Structures are given as structure tokens and as C-alpha cells.
């Protein structure tokens, strides 16, 4: 029975992963920025009410990340798996037109939040003698450049570099670091602006075609991730959902197999 912490675990791929871990009998700490778990979250996780806890945490603040570890470890006794999933998107806009507040938010959450989470988890896991740290890739991790998303992509490219470096630093220790590559996932993160409004990118015909053929629902990706996370012992592991081969096959089938997500 593994004990798991997931930052940004209240919705989207984070919540879907939490549910899959719970189905596997794990104990899960879900963190989010709200002071308490939403009613919707409580209802959705009702079948697992004795197997999870919610802890408020702003990953931009390292003292709150440290408190997250302390609370989870106190509640479950130890932590086996730490998933840095919390992320921040930005308006679909050219980088030079993006307000400074959004620049700060995406860097503080996607970069500093992952670094803080990895620092806290690595230190404590080295002390306890075991553990896994997983960081979530995204658009930009593979060097692909898409205009009007380059600020987000920059943070994800940096995250990949950081995680690979962390794995090298942890080489020869009982702690491993790895990457999760979910591909294109249908969540509010993709379909909404930071203010919660419908993203204008959804009206783009080219985006619609690509997403309908290459995108997936979060529960599909989570069901793929969790068994592999639980089975992994290798440092510098890379679990990839949307492989190049899978992408190629889907695009080849596109004229004959209609997939519609948006």
C-alpha cells in the first residue's frame, strides 16, 4: 500500500490520477489552493473517504510545500510517491502582449513550484531511505514551439531539463526522479483561460482537428500512468502516453475514424 502526494490534485489529470491510485488501494494526499476541499471533490471521492486527505498548499511558497509533506507524512506515516502536478496556464496570447502578472504566475507555479516540491520530497525521501518523485511534462517539453503558448512551453521545457538533472543527482541513492508525459488532455487547463472563461483557441479549426485526433480524456491517461508508476523502480524513468508511433497511427486513421472531444 503506497502513500502518495499529488499537488494540483483537485481536478483534471491530477484528480484522475488520485482516483486511480485510490482504486489501487493507495493512501493519497491531494493538495490544492483552496482552504478546504470543494463539495464536488468530497462527493466524487466519497467511496474513498478513509483513504485520502485534502491539504491546502500554494506550491509557490516553499514553507507551504514543506508543511504539505509534514502533514501527509504525519497522517500516513510516510510518503512513497510525490507527484508535482500543479500547473498554471496563461492567456492564448503572444508573449510580448502577456501581462507581467501572468508571467510571474506561470514561472512561479510551473518552475518554482516543481523545484520546491522536488527539493522537499528529495530531502525527506533521502532521510527515510526510499521514494519516487514524478514531474509532469507538457507542451514544450519536447522542444515543439507553438505560438501564443511559448511562456507555458518554456516552463515545461525547463521542467524536463530540471528533472533529468535531478535524476542524475539522485543516481546511486534509494530515491528516483522521473517524468510523466500525458500528451494532450481534455481538461479545464486546456479549454479555459486563467479566469475560467472559454479559451479562444477552441475556435481554431486547426487546433480542433489536432486535438480531436491526438487528445484524450484525463481518466484514460491516468489509468495508463498509475500501474506503471507503481511498478517503476528505475531512476530517470519516462512514462509516455502519446508516443510518436501512437500519434502517427491516429493521424493516419483520421480520415476513417472520427474522434470528437471538443
Regions found by a protein language model. Name each.
Residues 24-41:
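Conserved glycine-rich Rossmann-like NAD(P)H-binding loop of the short-chain dehydrogenase/reductase
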Residues 10-11, 34:
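Conserved glycine-rich cofactor-binding loop
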Residues 132-158, 163-164, 168-171, 184:
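Catalytic loop of short-chain dehydrogenase/reductase
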Residues 179, 198-251:
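C-terminal helical subdomain
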Amino acid at each position: 500500500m503506497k502513500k502518495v502526494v499529488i499537488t494540483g490534485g483537485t481536478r483534471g489529470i491530477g484528480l484522475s490520477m488520485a482516483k486511480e491510485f485510490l482504486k489501487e488501494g493507495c493512501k493519497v494526499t491531494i493538495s490544492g489552493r483552496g482552504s478546504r476541499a470543494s463539495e464536488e471533490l468530497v462527493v466524487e471521492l466519497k467511496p474513498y473517504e478513509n483513504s485520502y486527505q485534502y491539504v491546502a498548499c500554494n506550491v509557490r511558497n516553499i514553507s507551504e510545500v514543506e508543511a504539505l509533506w509534514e502533514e501527509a507524512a504525519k497522517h500516513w506515516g510516510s510518503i512513497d510517491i510525490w507527484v508535482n502536478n500543479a500547473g498554471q496556464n496563461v492567456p492564448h496570447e503572444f508573449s510580448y502582449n502577456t501581462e507581467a502578472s501572468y508571467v510571474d504566475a506561470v514561472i512561479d507555479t510551473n518552475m518554482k513550484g516543481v523545484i520546491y516540491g522536488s527539493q522537499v520530497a528529495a530531502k525527506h525521501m533521502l532521510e527515510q531511505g526510499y521514494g519516487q518523485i514524478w514531474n509532469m511534462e507538457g507542451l514544450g517539453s519536447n522542444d515543439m514551439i507553438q505560438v501564443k503558448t511559448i511562456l507555458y512551453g518554456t516552463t515545461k521545457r525547463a521542467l524536463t531539463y530540471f528533472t533529468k538533472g535531478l535524476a542524475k543527482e539522485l543516481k546511486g541513492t534509494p530515491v528516483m526522479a522521473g517524468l510523466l508525459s500525458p500528451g494532450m488532455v481534455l481538461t479545464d487547463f486546456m479549454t479555459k483561460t486563467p479566469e475560467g472563461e472559454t479559451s479562444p483557441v477552441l475556435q481554431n479549426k486547426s487546433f480542433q482537428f489536432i486535438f480531436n485526433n491526438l487528445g484524450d480524456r484525463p481518466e484514460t491517461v491516468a489509468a495508463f500512468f498509475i500501474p506503471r508508476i507503481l511498478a517503476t523502480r528505475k531512476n530517470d524513468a519516462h512514462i509516455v502516453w502519446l508516443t510518436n508511433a501512437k500519434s502517427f497511427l491516429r493521424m493516419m486513421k483520421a480520415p476513417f475514424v472520427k474522434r470528437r472531444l471538443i
